[in-house]
Amino acid sequence: MNTAAIDQTNARSLDSTTASMVDPFGRAVTYLRVSVTDRCDFRCTYCMAEHMTFLPKKDLLTLEELHRLCSAFIAKGVRKLRLTGGEPLVRKNIMFLIRELGKEIEAGRLDELTLTTNGSQLSKFAAELVDCGVRRINVSLDTLDPDKFRQITRWGELTKVLEGIDAALAAGLKVKINAVALKDFNDAEIPELMRWAHGRGMDLTLIETMPMGEVDEDRTDHYLPLSEMRKRLEADFTLKDMSYRTGGPARYVDVLETGGRLGLITPMTHNFCESCNRVRLTCTGTLYMCLGQNDAADLRSALRATEDDAYLAQVIDDAISRKPKGHDFIIDREHNRPAVARHMSVTGG
């Protein structure tokens, strides 16, 4: 890890705490993704090994520390904040953090607070999420087949997730379904998954699998370029490119036959680096400037070194100055090691 070597005594004036974040390529950083835990109640085959060794709980930032870090980024121009994991809703007392961040929306300092979830805890938390100011969530769901769902999640129960989605919709949350497109696993189901989602007023976003972390399977066996998936869909559906954006990497098409939107996230075949507006913070206070690179900044040390937010802001600025132009993801038989050693559950997607 490349830790910012900055003398605390040379911290800039308080003006640095509100200076906007612009990387070396002129891209404004306005989107923060925060992995609040690396733990999850599922073990999805493309995300983590079945017998994961998780971070010791003593290494995690407290919820109060995560709140302070998030507030520092909001002060520096972040307008959208997404909580991820692992599974964010399994973190003990997570609603404290969500409620505190919701106050930033009330104050006009944050435009959107959202989260990505596997749906297993939504029946319990959906109504409270709305009360805290969350209006939109992403739910990861790769198949509607109970047996395949158990196979890919290893531990998950499809019924529980579907009940959670129903609870979210009933509470008034806008739900988007995220599905990783996997060759010879769920690719034949994508049309039906799309009809199901659109029929319930939900967008569907397809995602290419990414080479992150050691897992128990060879990713090349299931890698499916979304350019190929789109061609298959166009045999039965009329897909019209849209300018619609949500602030993330998805490119959207309108599906005329269903009246819904289909998003495509293509880090492998058509990366989204040129418009990247985001950085990722882990539950240990590590800031990754790029999903597909290993360079990182240690914000935990800066956070705990002083109560002076000007020093923390300077460490953040130093990290943003190292944000790379793009990633180097490759999936093929010659590159069977992951491009990035850390698991997606650590980085938060």
UniProtKB/Swiss-Prot annotation:
SMART domains: Elp3 (SM00729). Its cofactor is [4Fe-4S] cluster. Pathway: Cofactor biosynthesis; molybdopterin biosynthesis. GO terms for molecular function: 4 iron, 4 sulfur cluster binding; cyclic pyranopterin monophosphate synthase activity; GTP 3',8'-cyclase activity; GTP binding; metal ion binding; S-adenosyl-L-methionine binding. [4Fe-4S] cluster 2 binds at residues 273, 276, 290. [4Fe-4S] cluster 1 binds at residues 40, 44, 47. Transmembrane segments: none annotated. Its EC number is 4.1.99.22. It catalyses: GTP + AH2 + S-adenosyl-L-methionine = (8S)-3',8-cyclo-7,8-dihydroguanosine 5'-triphosphate + 5'-deoxyadenosine + L-methionine + A + H(+). It is an enzyme of class 4 (lyase). Binds 2 [4Fe-4S] clusters. Binds 1 [4Fe-4S] cluster coordinated with 3 cysteines and an exchangeable S-adenosyl-L-methionine and 1 [4Fe-4S] cluster coordinated with 3 cysteines and the GTP-derived substrate. GTP binds at residues 33, 82, 116, 176, 278-280. Pfam families: Fer4_12, Mob_synth_C, Radical_SAM. InterPro entries: Aldolase_TIM, Elp3/MiaA/NifB-like_rSAM, MoaA, MoaA_NifB_PqqE_Fe-S-bd_CS, MoaA_twitch, MoCo_biosynth_MoaA/MoaC, rSAM. Belongs to the radical SAM superfamily. MoaA family. Catalyzes the cyclization of GTP to (8S)-3',8-cyclo-7,8-dihydroguanosine 5'-triphosphate. This is GTP 3',8-cyclase.
